[in-house]
Amino acid sequence: MAEITASMVKELREKTDAPMMECKKALTEAAGDLAKAEEILRVKLGSKASKAASRVTAEGIVATWQSADGKLAALVEVNCETDFVAKNDDFLAFSAAVAELVATRNPADVAAIGALDLGGQTVEQVRTALVGKIGENITIRRFTRIDAQGAVASYIHAGAKIGVLVDLVGGSEALGKDLAMHIAAAKPKALMASEIPAELIDTERRIAIEKAREAGKPEAMLDRIADGTVQKFLKEVTLLGQPFVKDDKLTIEALLKSRNASVASFVLYIVGEGIEKKVSDFAAEVAAQAAAAAQK
């Protein structure tokens, strides 16, 4: 059998970006044939990616990209399994690259991103290799692309766990940044009341009526009480109705009016929002890992 040297391992690692021990194993299996070892690694990395695909990816980051003139921007959420990997440099670089591709290439949906070119490979090939290198499932969950009416302001908060884009027409760069930070803090569901789904308003109304009834309020007053409750709810969940976080005596609508500005649209992403996280049994995980190691 050919001797597997450190320089051979280094060369294969540089070509494939695979972990060092995986490179050594592949070279051993290939009897020192570098090309064959590379093929073996491609198969193994693909296999790892397939095995990881069923695992929950509730951690991750949001990443943004925007043009210098603020006219084009994108916000993406890329998920992984643990917060540790969410801080990995390769994972961060991949997420940033995906955000730029979304903005500049305008894919139709998440599936279409996988076919885009990224450094001579498809995004899906790069993702698969990254899964093999890191050992965790990685998924591109969602994206929003804004072709701005005005100029886009962005804000990333809390270790890239919350991301905001705001298309601000008029105003200033400072106002855009303030609005983006406000959205991250206040988390509005919509820009204005007309964008809130009717079924959500109906639910709030029914709850208000039942609460008032249980409190012993007269039946003749229930509708009026419900109206007031719904109006309060709409102010709480719409950007224009919310009090400005830096001055709660001023609503966002009033703030915009005072600056002769308007918001064309905004998007808010919170990492893992709506994903049910798997509750781990640490002892069971250790036992499973020990059993798997014993079988090798």
Swiss-Prot record:
NCBIfam families: tsf. Pfam families: EF_TS (PF00889). Belongs to the EF-Ts family. One of its GO terms (cellular component) is cytoplasm. PROSITE patterns: EF_TS_2. Associates with the EF-Tu.GDP complex and induces the exchange of GDP to GTP. It remains bound to the aminoacyl-tRNA.EF-Tu.GTP complex up to the GTP hydrolysis stage on the ribosome. Keywords: Cytoplasm, Elongation factor, Protein biosynthesis. One of its GO terms (molecular function) is translation elongation factor activity. It is found in: Cytoplasm. Residues 82-85 are annotated as: Involved in Mg(2+) ion dislocation from EF-Tu. It comes from the Bacteria. InterPro entries: EF-Ts_dimer_sf, Transl_elong_EFTs/EF1B, Transl_elong_EFTs/EF1B_dimer, Transl_elong_Ts_CS, UBA-like_sf. This is Elongation factor Ts. It comes from Aromatoleum aromaticum (strain DSM 19018 / LMG 30748 / EbN1) (Azoarcus sp. (strain EbN1)). Its main location: cytoplasm.
